[in-house]
């Protein structure tokens, strides 16, 4: 069944001439792991998994026959300690010494059908590597409506072996859903039966969305994806046919370097490879991987992992996208020690959160931790937050204990770009902005601690002085088990409150000693009272303009707000500067992240480029220098992160997009990008503008102040007019601004300069 590879190599040569990616640099080598405590009861435990996926949330309804799980987590109410039980096998090699087989679950999706050819390029890299009888890639194809090569067939699930610079079609089966556990299980059962070796790896190749939405979007089956629970079920079913673990399981996709993922894989593999941040379309360097194994057939997962991470970083750097790069190699033999320590830590943090006076401050601390995959209005939310960042940020409220030591101990190696210098190596779900009840249901089934579930529930549900109880997650005896959460031990409707949340800019938790006003020095300012300080987590400002007397256009967000979190006093620090295209066309800009030292701020701007909606990413250095990263499509409706950050090209037509008062969109004037163009940061044009404070509360709602009018004159001076009241209620940040009812004569004549 061998096919000629001449044509496919020609296609490969074409796609390899392109380069696409998404990220940054910094070599951050993890410390050696310490010896783990004996927390594992090596007995097989197989139970039913999480509920079937609902098509309203995932795009398809999937049933997985004979669902299984290879581990159990439990906490006793008597001591609150986490106990772990994992399935085990004989630990006996399944093939000849010095032979490596890497199984690749190649779900092409739009990374192929859009003409990008990313999967095709990676298979080309496998073919270009040094030949050896001791290294082979075994591939299953699917998930895309079109391949960028003439070898793979769209209407079939095909299985190929790449070895010694050749590719052979060895099996072709009925096309099935790559987002279904049964498809993965079938491939792996067939694979380990026919291509077992001393060391075996598994790579998930496609889009990823983090712990909640999982990996591998099958665009032929309603964009269904593999949840972590389904990966667990598939791996458990094949594990019973194996006498040894996979040497590694890795994700050549975005955002899967998470604690929830590592917990699932610990039963089945020795190492996990995953990125906390988004990955570029070019992904891993399979030539480097294969060449290393050809020369080092006895290498273990840690040694290979370092090569994977370093060569991945180099791939990103070649395309000038190394800044966002992250890749972590986790020693899963040490991971259970981390789980035990994390549960202890989560218990302490949960106790601290029950003090309503401290909860707002804790959430404010977590807000400052690094997060990954957008997490803003323009790009969407993944709710993936750095574990080390959470622990360090909350150190004043909960003793870290040994959790950071255990975390470092299980990180064999990681490679971080300059935008993620402090990333600890693993993320965890945290409800920065909940997208609905299904998100919380999925999380409860994969969570690694009942106390951490309780914290997430407390934040998502808006706990205040009315009291909070986490009894719903425990039995009458005070015990907890992940089996109970997976099997809907508690009411399946419990999280429905997340579908009823409405955020309208009138948070009752944000209260003032002095409400926003313009003071005698021309500063727009306010002072929170004690209650407001307890619940406020961040303060920013929104800038808007009246486009044509009828259209109220929001320019975006600025973090230029001065404040004191001890006294509750805040005042504007807006200097009148804004970002624009080279011809002066203003961009709508929103803050993605900024460094604590003020040396770097990352922004995103919604735009249309060549007719396609996307986001323009750029960062600003401490001296005001602007660096364009490129365009990124953000998080799609399936919760998957786009893999590419595309560089702007000469001739690209850019149209800025702005949000209006009702959250609809308004397009500005188009601009044709020329090579050598740069964004500008200069005074806003002479005219009238509007300024409003945004104060976020601990639960995702916010308070928006009345807009005040400020003018910029021909000299660039900022003038606030009136007493700070436009006569617009805070509701109108996302409502009807009532221009017809507005009378400019209502303002006092006094003007303020600064």
Specify the residue positions occupied by each region the protein language model found:
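Catalytic-core segments of thiol-dependent peptidases
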Residues: 141-243, 253-254, 259, 276-277
